[in-house]
Amino acid sequence: MEKVQQTIRAPRGTELQTKGWVQEAALRMLMNNLDPEVAEKPEELVVYGGIGRAARNWESYQAIVDSLKTLESDETLLVQSGKPVAIFKSHEDAPRVLLANSNLVPKWANWDHFRELEKKGLMMYGQMTAGSWIYIGTQGILQGTYETFGEAARQHFDGSLKGTLTLTAGLGGMGGAQPLAVTMNGGVVIAIDVDKRSIDRRIEKRYCDMYTESLEEALTVANEYKEKKEPISIGLLGNAAEILPELVKRDITPDLVTDQTSAHDPLNGYIPVGYTLEEAAKLREKDPERYVQLSKESMTKHVEAMLAMQEKGAITFDYGNNIRQVAFDEGLKNAFDFPGFVPAFIRPLFCEGKGPFRWVALSGDPEDIYKTDEVILREFADNEHLCNWIRMARQQVEFQGLPSRICWLGYGERAKFGRIINEMVANGELSAPIVIGRDHLDCGSVASPNRETEAMKDGSDAVADWPILNALINSVNGASWVSVHHGGGVGMGYSLHAGMVIVADGTEAAAKRIERVLTSDPGMGVVRHVDAGYDLAVETAKEKGVNIPMMK
């Protein structure tokens, strides 16, 4: 991948670079994904998650920008793995962009084949929100991480992480949410990363409190704050596959253990034991096969240490990066003895159609987001947990790129909120349209047996019809852009998932599209979990009037 040193920043204000606000939204969100405040390696088009890109290469990026600038409001741009391949006449209620990223026929759905295609310039890895142009920086995963640690606290620590120590690793675009999520729940956390730049970035954006290169200092500070029952987050420079076994050797057992290193990609995401970043980069280039093998061996040691800590009483869970699968394939037969975070903590929310709903102010004016915060606090005042989240986010979350907000809303709530936002744009309360979207990690848009659909009640973990149906219904209902990806979060061969974005531009047509899309999208989550036999999903469907032909 050619590196290009240029600063990309989404336009602000109400002046259009395109022929309509939906096209403008797509353009601004693509550019926002590559804003240096947002992207991990913008010079390589990498947004987050190892090699999760916004476009296949710089030529494709420019072609997408040019296409969006000339796209009519009754046309649809097709993007294949980060390359614009066609513009067809459609209609005004159709999506302006349809994206398919990283999708491979199952027999060939592995990293080796993907890399062959990538080398030939035929494919890119879109992760989840990188290639679908709706990444908002670390805030995008923050509430989900906060909810996960909050539920762990409710289940195991009397509702708070006060006086507890969490040990984790990985402070990239996704994992970087962990330190703040733990301290928001009152706990102490040591978060390990091998890349000083990642730790520095989290400290700069106030997601992490302090930096150290010393395990001794990290433990001393952690114990001091744990005793005081005060929260602190400590970014520790080092390799988790070395530090965790060392802690096991010393008989030091944290209260909570997880991991968000980029283990989903053994070549580009994980650094083997004994290598600096520079040495790893050289080996990756010179001998990728040896690199991958060393990486897998290190991951196995990492998981062995997590299992040892679990045996000693630590609440241990996988945070969706497929590290257990790698260790299992390397011969560690009890790698799956600790659960994934979705079955352990999140699935009840999915049954209610809840998930990581987000919105972005295209104006670039933070006041537009603060006004929408007030809407949440007013309209959902009976949901104390949600309102607490909004208040904390306002105080503690620094915007990256265009101002944005995330909160978990369920079936019915999303459509209600979308209607209000569109009205606020229409009457001028908000200074420009709002983009409404979500992560692909949602209640009804993913098939990922080692993450979102792990341990489904009926054994349907690997059934991949659901994300396809999700993308289809969102497209026909008028989402502004819709994406279908493969391999996000857990790597090639392990997931299929769909994303959607809808623009609230204040028009009556947008109001109708918002009503349809923000009903069917979370509705798919309720339907998927009803089909799998979850009582809470059945209750939700009956209470909310979701029409499911064979529901009992």
Swiss-Prot record:
It catalyses: 4-imidazolone-5-propanoate = trans-urocanate + H2O. Its cofactor is NAD(+). Keywords: Cytoplasm, Histidine metabolism, Lyase, NAD. NAD(+) binds at residues 49-50, 127, 173-175, 193, 239-240, 260-264, 270-271, 319, 489. It is found in: Cytoplasm. The keyword Metal-binding does not apply. GO terms for biological process: L-histidine catabolic process to glutamate and formamide; L-histidine catabolic process to glutamate and formate. Binds 1 NAD(+) per subunit. Pathway: Amino-acid degradation; L-histidine degradation into L-glutamate; N-formimidoyl-L-glutamate from L-histidine: step 2/3. The keyword Cytoplasm applies. The active site is at 407. Its EC number is 4.2.1.49. One of its GO terms (molecular function) is urocanate hydratase activity. GO terms for cellular component: cytoplasm. Transmembrane segments: none annotated. Belongs to the urocanase family. Catalyzes the conversion of urocanate to 4-imidazolone-5-propionate. This is Urocanate hydratase. It comes from Bacillus cereus (strain B4264). The gene is hutU.
